[in-house]
Amino acid sequence: MTTQKLIRSLFTLATFAAAALFAGCGTTSGYKQADKTGEGIAEFREEIVHGKKAIDATMKSLDQIATSAATDPRKAFEQFSKSVANLESTAGKVRDRGQDMKAQGKAYFAQWEKEMGEVQNEEVRSLAMSRKEKLQSTFEAIAKSAEPLKAQFGPWMTGLKDLEKFLSNDLTIAGVDAAKGLFAKARADGAEVQKSMDALIAELNSVAATITPAKAAAK
């Protein structure tokens, strides 16, 4: 083999290895965009965790209304109202973070496709596009994992707000007693919402680990 052919072969191998190492996106800006996408996933995940805590707080305040109905449920009801408002606010933040994450992912994969379109080596380009399609499919699986949560949360939140209105007009012992069935339903449905949150959190962890390059833990 001539020196010139050897150099060309080594260059091709090096290019191929670099592409494989970064899952098809061999530029600094590319992995930074992947990190940004990972950060978006982490922020979305964090808001969902906050949502779980907000549900716990809401259910706790609802229980306190039931236990204090025969004495003085006013303070417990005020806390319940605050918890419902906080939960609604947190839900808005989850939606916002979800949109941010989606936009960052879209930018990441668009940049990846653009850069790989400029790659001259057909083998490298083919590998890169194959990896991109696989990871993009993984990223888009987040939306599917979020569907049960979206389907459950809206009706449950509406039920909580309706219960809040009911109690605000009838916080008597008899009124609270009459709403016991609604209390039980709110708790049961809230637990199902949290299960869907757990499933989505697990999916987000998996996707983030798949999309972003490995990073050493801080010492």
Residue ranges of each PLM-predicted region?
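Bacterial N-terminal signal peptides that target proteins for export
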Residues: 2-14
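Long amphipathic all-alpha helical oligomerization modules
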Residues: 29-40, 154-219
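A short structural micro-motif
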Residues: 86, 133-137, 185-189
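Extended amphipathic alpha-helical interaction segments
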Residues: 97, 101-180, 213
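Immediate post-signal-peptide N-terminus of mature secreted/exported proteins
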Residues: 26-89
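Amphipathic alpha-helical hairpins
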Residues: 27-29, 61-79, 111-130, 174, ...
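Long amphipathic alpha-helices with heptad-repeat character
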Residues: 41-55, 84-87, 91-105, 146-153, ...
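C-terminal motif of bacterial Sec signal peptides marking the signal peptidase cleavage site
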Residues: 21-24
